[in-house]
Amino acid sequence: MITVRMAMARMFAIAALALLAACSGTQDNASTRQLDVLLIPADGGTESGTLADYQPLFDAVGNMADLNFDLKVAQSYGAVVDAMCSGTADIAFVGPVTYLQAKERNCAELLAVAVEDGQSIYYAGLFARNDSPIQTLTDVRGKSVAFGDVNSTSSFIIPITMLMEAGIDPVKDLGALRLTGTHANSLAALIEGRVDVAALSFDSYEKAVRSGIPGARDLRVVARSEAIPYPPLVMSSRLPDDLKQELRQAFKNVEKSPDIQPEMIRGYGGAQVDGYDTQFSSELFDSVARKMTRLSDELKGEILKKSSER
């Protein structure tokens, strides 16, 4: 027979075990360092889709380095730079231009760049509908064009310079200019017929096709850019040197992690990549820096003014 004393003893034993487990959990949580990760709103999917693309990668790195990552998607490219410089973000996925802006303010340094088929490059493009008469960049003159964020490499900086190199003044020669904020918004504006041309990355376009976005397959390429250095992962310059080294080592070996399948290692636009290069030279972004110099603050101001015209 189980007496009251025996029952109470059992209850105390269970409570003691629960307390030990709780204390152990608290210690485990305390030993697991948390880092805040901010992702630019760059791809052709939703915010939840962007998080889903990168969560498996950071989970694997977290297990390898005993780290916990809190991922969020920023509202704009500029917000990511501000977060890195204010110390509210430790790591960020950014475009080349965003990286250069943060680097110039001494807020960020390269962490890793995705590698696919031995390369770390991507492309920007100008797209039109299949039924459009627009065939080349020259045909874009007088047409309405949608661009993304003014700090976006592949949905603004590179496409604008492509037009300029084709002899088209984005302020004087375009019929209308729209700044939609994201690649996905520009793509939607084109599909819905609100603009004649949209500027976005090929990764974002291909993700829209893979995701079955209605109308995405009814578009064609007007022009493709030269190869651009792949959007990097960057880390705060404020992080301790030993932590920076831990992060680099973990990303370098992430494809060897037993906790991750090859299809879980993704990069920009949710595309599967082979792994991450932590030795990528910042000098490889010099070509983008040169493109940036062509867009003066005065020209950007005129573009912003034109984009507000209706």
Describe the predicted segments one by one.
Residues 40-42, 123-134, 228-242:
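A bilobed periplasmic-binding-protein/Venus flytrap-type ligand-binding module shared by bacterial periplasmic
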Residues 78-92, 105, 138, 182-203:
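Short helices/loops that flank or line small-molecule/ion binding pockets
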Residues 29-97:
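Extracytoplasmic small-molecule ligand-binding "clamshell" domains
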Residues 143-242, 249:
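Pocket-lining segment of extracytoplasmic ligand-binding domains
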Residues 24-27:
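Bacterial signal peptide processing site
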Residues 33-56, 234-310:
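An extracytoplasmic/periplasmic, membrane-proximal ligand-sensing/linker region
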Residues 20-22:
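C-terminal motif of bacterial Sec signal peptides marking the signal peptidase cleavage site
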Residues 36-50, 139-155:
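Short loop->beta-strand "edge-of-pocket" segments that line small-molecule binding or catalytic clefts
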